[in-house]
Regions:
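Short linear sequence elements within intrinsically disordered, low-complexity coil regions
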Residues: 8, 14-18, 175, 240, ...
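Long alpha-helical rod scaffolds of large eukaryotic non-enzymatic complex subunits
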Residues: 218-260
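Structured all-alpha helical bundle cores of eukaryotic regulatory proteins
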Residues: 26-198, 202-232
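Intrinsically disordered, low-complexity regions enriched in small/polar residues
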Residues: 5, 14-15, 61, 144, ...
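A eukaryotic "domain-start" boundary segment
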Residues: 1-50, 260
Length: 260
């Protein structure tokens, strides 16, 4: 199964994400590199969208933490194969069927530009993707169905419109970006989609001083029970990620709107 037990989360993941140590940010740096590769591959396929990229990152986190691969030591080719395989599985699980040759050709183009001395052919890349796909599916327990946190943000759009003068679409877009960035962390392996959504809104509320947004109102809109301890826990983890980022206010449209 994709989701983790509370015991696994407490014993292995939570300490890594909450303790003040360099390992968290070192690991995050390498995960960002994986994310960048996935973004590039995703941008080159015709059905490119944020949903596919987010699902890909979920699969990567599960595979990464199940197999304990060392992101520092794996080869650039292995990174490409892992990213391509995660994207390939994600396209299928989101009902976007593409040929594996599409992924293979994108990876080959990257190799030609970034690894020109690497001697490898298309058939070998294809075989490696199929092998890695099976390994990733094993780490997922062959369960690829996963609910993403984006839907709940759309659901509360009317709430945004009722309590603030800020364009609801600006809020929606910003929430989507916060959620998308949160996939750099493995929080999606434990916390529910609605809880992640509310946590991201809570971070956004604090960062942009959106005093009109009441988190309790959002909790009441959720069809699932929201555990307040888990909400604070998830919020703290996401906030830690954004506190580390220097470009937290890079969304100038929102920042300008709020300041006015």
């Amino acid at each position: 199964m994709i989701y983790l037990t509370r015991e696994d989360w407490n014993n292995f993941f939570l300490p890594k994400l909450t303790q003040d140590n360099k390992s968290f940010f070192t690991e995050l740096k390498h995960i960002k590199n994986i994310h960048s590769i996935m973004q590039y591959i995703n941008s080159k396929i015709k059905i490119s969208n944020q949903i596919v990229l987010s699902i890909s990152m979920i699969y990567f986190h599960k595979f990464y933490n199940q197999t304990l691969i060392n992101l520092i030591n794996i080869t650039p080719l292995d990174k490409l194969i892992i990213c391509g395989s995660c994207i390939f599985i994600a396209t299928k699980s989101s009902n976007h069927l593409i040929r594996v040759s599409v992924i293979v050709n994108i990876i080959m183009d990257i190799i030609k530009k970034k690894l020109p001395n690497l001697n490898i052919d298309l058939d070998t890349i294809k075989e490696k993707i199929f092998q890695k796909e099976f390994q990733i599916l094993q780490s997922l327990g062959f369960c690829v169905n996963f609910e993403l946190p984006y839907k709940f943000i759309i659901k509360i759009k009317n709430y945004f419109e009722s309590i603030t003068n800020i364009s609801s679409q600006i809020l929606i877009d910003s929430c989507f970006q916060f959620i998308s960035d949160s996939f750099l962390l493995p929080i999606s392996l434990y916390y529910t989609p609605n809880l992640i959504s509310i946590s991201c809104v809570k971070v956004m509320k604090e960062k942009f001083n959106l005093v009109d947004i009441n988190i309790n109102d959002l909790i009441s809109l959720s069809e699932y029970k929201i555990d307040l301890n888990e909400l604070n826990e998830c919020y703290s983890i996401i906030k830690k990620l954004y506190d580390k980022e220097e470009n937290i206010t890079s969304n100038s449209s929102l920042s300008t709107k709020v300041s006015n």
